[in-house]
Amino acid sequence: MEIDNKSRIHWACRRGMRELDIAIMPFFEHDYDTLNDSDKRAFVRLLQSDDPDLFNWLMNHGEPKDGELKRMISLIQTRNKDRGPVAM
């Protein structure tokens, strides 16, 4: 998936697990455009992860072995915390 194909990335953000949608969609909608290309690639790679892995990582029940993905999880958590709850 290309980092500038926002419609495909948006679709990939919709996971089918409400908890993941609540974590990933606001980050994509509010923060994706501010990321540099390297971070955009890491985010797209993160979206290729399995839902159970994403859920566990975002809920702090483990972490990715890949350093870039680990940093992206941390960035998502930080930005979402700083932004606060959003209406879905």
Swiss-Prot record:
Asked if the keyword Hydrolase belongs to this entry, the reply reads: no
Q: Which UniProt keywords apply?
A: Chaperone, Cytoplasm
Q: Give the GO cellular component terms, alphabetically.
A: cytoplasm
Q: Which GO terms describe its biological process?
A: succinate metabolic process
Looking up Pfam families in the UniProt record yields: Sdh5 (PF03937)
Q: Where is the signal peptide?
A: none
> Which cysteines link up through disulfide bonds?
none
What highest taxon heads this organism's lineage?
Answer: Bacteria
Q: What is its main location?
A: cytoplasm
The cellular location(s) given in this protein's UniProt record come to: Cytoplasm
Q: Which InterPro entries match?
A: SDH, SDH_sf, SdhE_FAD_assembly_factor
* Gene3D superfamilies (UniProt xref): Flavinator of succinate dehydrogenase
The family line of this record is: Belongs to the SdhE FAD assembly factor family.
Q: How does it assemble?
A: Monomer.
Q: State what this protein does.
A: An FAD assembly protein, which accelerates covalent attachment of the cofactor into other proteins. Plays an essential role in the assembly of succinate dehydrogenase (SDH, respiratory complex II), an enzyme complex that is a component of both the tricarboxylic acid cycle and the electron transport chain, and which couples the oxidation of succinate to fumarate with the reduction of ubiquinone (coenzyme Q) to ubiquinol. Required for flavinylation (covalent attachment of FAD) of the flavoprotein subunit SdhA of SDH and other flavinylated proteins as well.
Q: What is this protein called?
A: FAD assembly factor SdhE
Taxonomic placement: Bacteria, Pseudomonadati, Pseudomonadota, Gammaproteobacteria, Enterobacterales
Q: Which gene encodes it?
A: sdhE
